[in-house]
Structures are given as C-alpha cells and as structure tokens.
C-alpha cells in the first residue's frame, strides 16, 4: 500500500481542491457560502475518500462514493458557470481536473472489483 499522498489521483484531487478554493474565494457573497461552500466540501470529501480507499481492504465502496461526489462537484461547477459566478476558463480548468480524478477512480474501482489473478 502506497502512502496516499504519493498517489497520482491524490495529487490531482489536491490540485482540484486548490483550484476550487480560489474559485470560491472570488464568488459573490450571496453564493460563496451556499454553492461555493458545497463545492469545497465535496472536494475535501473526495480527498478523504481517496485516503479511505487506499487504507481499506474493500476499496470499491469508497471509490463508488468518490465518483458520486465528483459528479455532484461537476454539477455545482456547471451551475456556477451558468450563473456566471465563475468564468468559462475557470470552469474548464476545474472540469479538466474532475475528469482526470474520475478516470483514475474508475480504473482503480475496476481493478478493485476484478478477481485477483
């Protein structure tokens, strides 16, 4: 078992949290605590789920929840862009990172569900 901070998925998820923190900081006050707070909370939970999956024998449930929370974060990011709370370029950067985390999590989950060879 590798240290979770050395995993490629962790590094990308941390970058996502960093980007989201900057996005939320610049949101209008009315939306900062509602939409912005929820996006930040989901991203923190994604990082925590990576840690849990790395430590657990049965990784699939944690990875399934991670993928679900990633979808919620993407939905809230899209809403933020549609409401013009963030720019299209900021949205594109965040979605690039969520896509990378999603691909890695899906591959890790597939690997965890496959019978040991």
Predicted regions and their residues:
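Amphipathic alpha-helical assembly/interaction segments
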Residues: 1-117
């Amino acid at each position: 078992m590798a240290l979770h901070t050395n995993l490629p998925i962790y590094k990308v998820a941390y970058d996502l949290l960093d980007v989201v923190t900057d996005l939320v900081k610049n949101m209008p006050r009315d939306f900062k605590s509602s939409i912005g707070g929820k996006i930040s909370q989901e991203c923190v939970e994604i990082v925590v789920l990576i840690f849990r999956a790395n430590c657990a024998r049965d990784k699939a449930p944690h990875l399934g929840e991670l993928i679900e929370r990633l979808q919620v974060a993407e939905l809230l990011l899209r809403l933020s862009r549609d409401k013009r709370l963030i720019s299209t370029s900021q949205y594109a950067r965040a979605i690039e990172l969520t896509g990378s985390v999603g691909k890695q999590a899906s591959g890790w989950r597939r690997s965890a569900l496959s019978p040991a060879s």
